[in-house]
């Protein structure tokens, strides 16, 4: 099986930092690190199964959406693999920022 690669946009990188910092404050370092591992595993699943996320063609630009625990991973597919555009809390109004 051929596995695509994934990469993070700058905004997605910042989202991960923000999620980690908030997680440390709320739940402690160990839990924040476990949650980061969970998100990274989801990124790997997206790379292995790029169509796992539901396509949202009504958003501009169109993105795929994949849930991961309390967060939503927004990504697009291109010739280089999966670009993780944002990682947003599922309870946020993330639709307006779907494209980054």
Swiss-Prot record:
<dbReference type="Pfam" id="PF05016">
    <property type="entry name" value="ParE_toxin"/>
</dbReference>
<dbReference type="InterPro" id="IPR035093">
    <property type="entry name" value="RelE/ParE_toxin_dom_sf"/>
</dbReference>
<keyword id="KW-1277">Toxin-antitoxin system</keyword>
<comment type="similarity">
    <text>Belongs to the RelE toxin family.</text>
</comment>
<dbReference type="InterPro" id="IPR028344">
    <property type="entry name" value="ParE1/4"/>
</dbReference>
<dbReference type="InterPro" id="IPR051803">
    <property type="entry name" value="TA_system_RelE-like_toxin"/>
</dbReference>
<comment type="function">
    <text>Toxic component of a type II toxin-antitoxin (TA) system. Its toxic effect is neutralized by coexpression with cognate antitoxin ParD4 but no other ParD or RelB antitoxin.</text>
</comment>
<protein>
    <recommendedName>
        <fullName>Toxin ParE4</fullName>
    </recommendedName>
</protein>
<dbReference type="InterPro" id="IPR007712">
    <property type="entry name" value="RelE/ParE_toxin"/>
</dbReference>
């Amino acid at each position: 099986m051929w596995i695509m690669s994934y990469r993070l946009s700058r905004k997605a990188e910042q989202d991960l930092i923000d999620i980690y910092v908030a997680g440390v404050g709320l739940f402690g370092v160990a839990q924040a690190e476990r949650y980061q591992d969970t998100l990274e595993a989801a990124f790997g699943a997206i790379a292995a199964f790029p169509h796992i996320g539901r396509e949202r063609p009504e958003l501009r630009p169109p993105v795929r959406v994949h849930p991961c625990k309390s967060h939503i991973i927004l990504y697009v597919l291109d010739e280089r693999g999966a670009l993780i555009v944002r990682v947003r809390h599922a309870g946020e109004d993330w639709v307006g920022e779907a494209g980054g």
